[in-house]
Amino acid sequence: MKRQFVFFAMMIFAVMVFAQGVYTKPCTDKALEKKAVKWVNSGKWRNGFKMATPHESVNVVEFYTQYKKNPEQWKAMFKWLSTRDLLTIEKGKYTIEGTKLIASVEDSENGDLSERKSESHYKHIDFQFVVKGTERFGIIDHETSKPNSQYRPDVIHYEYDNNKTLFYDSTPDKFFIFFPDDWHIAKINTCLLYTSPSPRD
């Protein structure tokens, strides 16, 4: 299925812990976690952007922490999103003035899981918002994954266990953020059923 989405490569320097594995950067500071959740729910980060909220997979502590480190970058990104017609914008790459952000607008097709590479970034943050159509994302387990390539700025790929991977389908009211500790797969077909381990098992 073709879908229109907006992807940001965020030049911000920078593990979700389930019983089944490790999927993101952990937080042991309950006070910070509570503050981050309250901040996200308050919508103070929106800067006029009202189309979507963070997907449940987003590490809200990292979102809060990275936003506080680089508020002007995040404000500019959300302002850009709020002042564009994302359903009709032309495909291409857009530099957001006054920032290190690049928005990549694509209209493409998903692929089979076997054709998609997992990845993570040491310095970048991926913000992905599918505004039309559906895209499946996967988040892979750190404990059962290992690099299968040399790092090249700014990406590295992994071998991973499908059965330990968490899969999520996009909806137009949610966006995804993949921080450096979120090892992920994008552009996966949604026509096949993948079984994800339950985070509450």
Mark where each language-model region is.
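A short, N-terminal "cap"/entry segment at the start of jelly-roll beta-barrel domains
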Residues: 36-104, 115
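Bacterial Sec-dependent N-terminal signal peptides
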Residues: 1-27
